[in-house]
Amino acid sequence: MARYRRHSRSRSRSRYRRRRRRRSRHHNRRRTYRRSRRHSRRRRGRRRGYSRRRYSRRGRRRY
């Protein structure tokens, strides 16, 4: 389904852009506060895990 929507740009963009733009402005600000407070631990845990594996040398030197 994702491929079909991407290829049909003329019709999908006109309808999806208008709906997403109106919702994105109002809902993005409200969801950012809720997600940041609730899932802040999960996101930080995942980011720390990746940062240690990728930037293990840089992290040790900085600390």
Swiss-Prot record:
The reply to whether Nucleus figures as a keyword in the UniProt entry is yes
**UniProt-annotated location(s):** Nucleus; Chromosome
Q: Region Disordered: list its residue ranges.
A: 1-63
Q: Which GO terms describe its cellular component?
A: nucleosome; nucleus
Name the InterPro entries for this protein: Protamine_P1
One of the entry's Gene Ontology molecular-function terms is: DNA binding
| Superkingdom field | Eukaryota
Tissue localization of expression? Testis.
Specify whether Phosphoprotein is a keyword of the entry: no
Per the UniProt entry, what is one GO biological process? Answer: chromosome condensation
Q: Which UniProt keywords apply?
A: Chromosome, Developmental protein, Differentiation, DNA condensation, DNA-binding, Nucleosome core, Nucleus, Spermatogenesis
Q: Which family does it belong to?
A: Belongs to the protamine P1 family.
Role played: Protamines substitute for histones in the chromatin of sperm during the haploid phase of spermatogenesis. They compact sperm DNA into a highly condensed, stable and inactive complex.
Protein name according to UniProt: Sperm protamine P1
- What is the species listed in this Swiss-Prot or TrEMBL entry? Antechinus stuartii (Brown marsupial mouse)
